[in-house]
Amino acid sequence: MRVLCVAEKNSIAKSVASILGGGHVRRRDTRSKYVKNYDFSFNFGGNVGSSDVTMTSVSGHLTEASFPSEYSSWSSVPQDVLFDAQIITSVSKNAEVLADNIKKEARNAQYLYIWTDCDREGEHIGVEISNVARASNPSIQVIRADFNNLERSHIISAAKRPRDVSKNAADAVDARIELDFRLGAIFTRLQTIQLQKSFDILQNKIISYGPCQFPTLGFVVDRWQRVEDFVPETYWHLRFVDKRQGKTIQFNWERAKVFDRLTTMIILENCLECKTAKVVNITQKPKTKYKPLPLSTVELTKLGPKHLRISAKKTLELAENLYTNGFVSYPRTETDQFDSSMNLHAIIQKLTGAQEWDSYAEGLLAGDYRPPRKGKHNDRAHPPIHPVQMVHRSALPSQDHWKVYELITRRFLACCSDNAKGAETLVQVKMEEELFSKKGLLVTEKNYLEVYPYEKWESSDQLPEYRLHEEFQPHILDMMDSSTSSPSYITEPELIALMDANGIGTDATMAEHIEKVQEREYVIKRKKRGQGVTEFVPSSLGVALAKGYDEIGLEWSLTKPFLRKEMEVQLKNIENGQLNRNVLVHMILTQFRDVFHLTKQRFDCLKNSCRVYLMSHNEPQT
């Protein structure tokens, strides 16, 4: 039996071939310097049995969408014709040598074994590979490996338990590709032609539209507008300070702030007339700081910028590199709960021997282990991101690789630990009718915090002794004024959280959309003043587009998340077999026809917005 295996990347093909071939692998060059063929023998069992195997790969998607040549002229073809124009799906020029390699290797094979990533995109790439292989061998049988990491026993098990490629998942991607291609072409042509005619500054610029990029831009502009509109307000509060046992204790006024000076003065005078404060409540209770949930892709892309000072896109790229080298599990997953059948102790055992957490891992194995918390998400395809093998810092190609590996590993160990525990004391005092309070925290067991330095929970200065019903005179009781603080520009973790909550993109594509709006020069990334974190501000063009679409008066503006969110829900329904691909495409295109015609009719709103914001040349400082 001859079997052709095809992975999504050469690094995966090389790793899987090495595992299945048991070290007896012959490498052959292809016409692509990035892709090799690996020959070996393996007994798959079942219907396939002992086989001569060739493992090769693609480099992502093989095919691309295009319109026939008669639609290529932007100036002579009306944009709305593209709603119904034929779409040609063909092997992209960059992938032709890869497709030729698959055709050649498939000719004498009885089985095509798909080893692409086990996500929605991977299923579609699997279908693309199948179509190419069947062009040279129509009778080839197609099966698919179900795997989520490159640990040896897992790969061997996956090789012996194939499944079918998910047509529903591939159909969902096919629908998304068509919709993004049509809508991107239609609105990009409309915007570019109309705005280039009106503004010299845009003469050589493509004003690109993307169904996920524009809502991403909208989030950035919305936060920018809040900053622009902010007017500080003065407020007043009472300061209550006590001194005892050598400690200075500042209580918090439970009204927090009052925006009327006279009212605050009257309250202060009443308290001063009272002269003494009375302790009305002393509460001591246990406090718990819960350990983190198992790690999902969205959470990883938020933690990278926040704690590692690495962009979301770069964090995900580094995690994927760690995955292809067999150090961590598949990093594109929505799942934040471990299946009860997973042997987490075995993973912890592999992590011993590293000086960074050896003693901590040994402690978990010796009895400190606690089952991980269960989140609310399970994509049924992949477990949460976790380490698969121990790797030492010196074995990785860069410090950033280590930072991401360390984060994933420490997060996993934290998940397998106990919550942090402490005790909180609350003292409430009353003066006239005003309540003032002070809390003190004593952390008694750090537990997961010992291995997870990305979160802090520290004991406060301990409160001196207070007795219930005790009366005393405050050391200081006066009135202070302050001003409300401006909102800040949006950070990358905040932007990802908004995109996730509103269904903009998938866990695997959010970081790419953020990069894309920067490439399009709609959004600028800059260092937050006085801090190491970065923030996003819109460019003049970004503001002009967002404001212009808002002025058009669409029921759902293209820079708001509602249209894309609904589409993502429906794509899930296709994946789950609850909706037909063609039905969704027709429904979305009908919806966007109305959006297009109203946008074209009121395009002066966009032009006026560009006059206001582009002509100011007031770009944010980077």
From Swiss-Prot:
The active site is at Y330. It catalyses: ATP-independent breakage of single-stranded DNA, followed by passage and rejoining. The keyword Plastid does not apply. Residues 166-596 form the Topo IA-type catalytic domain. SMART domains: TOP1Ac (SM00437), TOP1Bc (SM00436), TOPRIM (SM00493). One of its GO terms (biological process) is recombination within rDNA repeats. It comes from the Eukaryota. Interacts with hus2. Releases the supercoiling and torsional tension of DNA introduced during the DNA replication and transcription by transiently cleaving and rejoining one strand of the DNA duplex. Introduces a single-strand break via transesterification at a target site in duplex DNA. The scissile phosphodiester is attacked by the catalytic tyrosine of the enzyme, resulting in the formation of a DNA-(5'-phosphotyrosyl)-enzyme intermediate and the expulsion of a 3'-OH DNA strand. The free DNA strand than undergoes passage around the unbroken strand thus removing DNA supercoils. Belongs to the type IA topoisomerase family. This is DNA topoisomerase 3. The lineage of its organism: Eukaryota, Fungi, Dikarya, Ascomycota, Taphrinomycotina. The gene is top3.
